[in-house]
């Protein structure tokens, strides 16, 4: 693999790629990141509780396969974005602890991505669950 020198863009050098860890270690690192986020981030705990409630309601209200796919995909997206948001916040905090406008933009933008996904997931959840809930309760 060819890499450009940081000091001289004209200079190209060959570098061997670092040895990659076995796939089991890679999964271990990923799960460690997920569990760290769950244990340290309040919003991730909220997302996990909501996911459990969605699964319970899904079984009670007998969601179709398509509805399950929508629900699983959306709360998977929300949780994945929360992980990315946490990573962005950690990297920004690693780089600087003082107020910087660009650091604020990075953190706020990452948080905004989670918020948009969470709002869309909530709206989709209402569209799926409210009619089924009303039928279940005998209102419709």
Where on the chain are the PLM-derived regions?
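Amphipathic, cytosolic membrane-interfacial segments at TM-TM junctions
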Residues: 92-109
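Hydrophobic alpha-helical transmembrane segments
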Residues: 2-87, 99-101, 113-140
